[in-house]
C-alpha cells in the first residue's frame, strides 16, 4: 500500500490496543470515536526501547508536549507493534507516565501500520516487520494535514520540532 499523504483520510481499525491513562487492563482503542472530532498528531515508531526511538525520536515529543497541545492539538498518538504492557513500561521509562495526552497504542498485527503504508522490514537484524517511522497531523475532519515519512531508520522529518513548525 502507498504511504499515507496530505489530503488522505486517516484510516481506522478495531485492532489497536492501549492501557487507559487511569490504568487497568489493555483494551481496544476505538479510533473511529475521535478521528472525526479531534485534532491529533500521530507518531509511529519501529520499537519501544530501541535506541533511535528512545534517545532521539520520542524525547522531543515528550519535552514539547505542552507546546504541541498549545497549538490546538488534542493529543499525541504513539504507534508501535509492541504490546500494551511494553508500551506502558516504555512510557514510564521515558518519564511520561503521567502525560495523559500522550497515548501509546499497540498495533500488534500491523493493521493500522499497513493502512498507513508504513511498514519496515527489519528481519535482517532480527526484528521482523515493524511500524515505520512517521509523523502525521490529522485535523478534526479526519484528514491528514501533514505527513512526514522517514526513509528507513532515519530520525529527521518526523521529529517534534518539524511537526511543531507545521502546526
UniProtKB/Swiss-Prot annotation:
UniProt keyword annotation of Hydrolase present? no
Cellular component GO terms, alphabetical: mitochondrion; peroxisomal membrane
The organism's superkingdom is given as Eukaryota
Q: What is its EC number?
A: 1.11.1.24
Induction remarks:
By methanol.
One function term, GO molecular function aspect: thioredoxin peroxidase activity
Instruction: State the InterPro entries in the record.
Output: PRX5-like, Redoxin, Thioredoxin-like_sf, Thioredoxin_domain
Q: Where is this motif: Microbody targeting signal?
A: 165-167
Q: Name one GO biological process term.
A: methanol metabolic process
Q: Which reactions fall under this protein's catalytic activity?
A: a hydroperoxide + [thioredoxin]-dithiol = an alcohol + [thioredoxin]-disulfide + H2O
The subcellular location is:
Peroxisome membrane
Q: Catalytic site residues?
A: 53 (cysteine sulfenic acid (-soh) intermediate)
Question: What are the Thioredoxin domain coordinates in residue numbering?
Answer: 4-167
State the annotated membrane topology for this chain: Peripheral membrane protein
Say which enzyme class the record assigns: oxidoreductase
* CDD domains named in the record: PRX5_like
Keywords for the protein's UniProt record, in alphabetical order: Allergen, Antioxidant, Membrane, Methanol utilization, Oxidoreductase, Peroxidase, Peroxisome, Redox-active center
Query: What family classification does the UniProt entry report for this protein?
Result: Belongs to the peroxiredoxin family. Prx5 subfamily.
This chain's function reads:
Thiol-specific peroxidase that catalyzes the reduction of hydrogen peroxide and organic hydroperoxides to water and alcohols, respectively. Plays a role in cell protection against oxidative stress by detoxifying peroxides and as sensor of hydrogen peroxide-mediated signaling events.
Q: What else is known?
A: The active site is a conserved redox-active cysteine residue, the peroxidatic cysteine (C(P)), which makes the nucleophilic attack on the peroxide substrate. The peroxide oxidizes the C(P)-SH to cysteine sulfenic acid (C(P)-SOH), which then reacts with another cysteine residue, the resolving cysteine (C(R)), to form a disulfide bridge. The disulfide is subsequently reduced by an appropriate electron donor to complete the catalytic cycle. In this 1-Cys peroxiredoxin, no C(R) is present and C(P) instead forms a disulfide with a cysteine from another protein or with a small thiol molecule.
Which PANTHER family does this UniProt record tie to the protein?
Answer: PEROXIREDOXIN, PEROXIREDOXIN-5, MITOCHONDRIAL
**UniProt protein name:** Putative peroxiredoxin-A
Task: Say which species the protein is native to.
Answer: Candida boidinii
Amino acid at each position: 500500500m502507498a504511504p499515507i499523504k496530505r489530503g488522505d483520510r486517516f484510516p481506522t481499525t478495531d485492532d489497536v490496543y492501549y492501557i487507559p491513562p487511569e490504568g487497568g487492563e489493555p483494551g481496544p482503542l476505538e479510533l473511529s470515536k475521535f478521528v472525526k472530532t479531534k485534532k491529533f498528531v500521530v507518531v509511529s515508531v519501529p520499537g519501544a526501547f530501541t535506541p533511535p526511538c528512545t534517545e532521539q525520536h520520542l524525547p522531543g515529543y515528550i519535552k514539547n508536549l505542552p507546546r504541541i497541545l498549545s497549538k490546538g492539538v488534542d493529543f499525541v498518538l504513539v504507534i508501535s507493534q509492541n504490546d500494551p504492557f511494553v508500551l506502558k513500561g516504555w512510557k514510564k521509562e521515558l518519564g511520561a507516565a503521567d502525560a495523559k495526552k500522550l497515548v501509546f497504542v499497540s498495533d500488534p498485527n500491523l493493521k493500522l501500520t499497513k493502512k498507513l503504508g508504513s511498514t519496515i522490514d527489519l528481519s535482517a537484524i532480527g526484528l521482523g516487520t515493524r511500524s515505520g517511522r512517521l509523523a502525521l497531523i490529522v485535523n478534526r475532519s479526519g484528514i491528514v494535514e501533514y505527513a512526514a515519512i522517514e526513509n528507513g531508520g532515519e530520525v529527521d522529518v518526523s521529529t517534534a520540532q518539524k511537526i511543531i513548525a507545521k502546526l
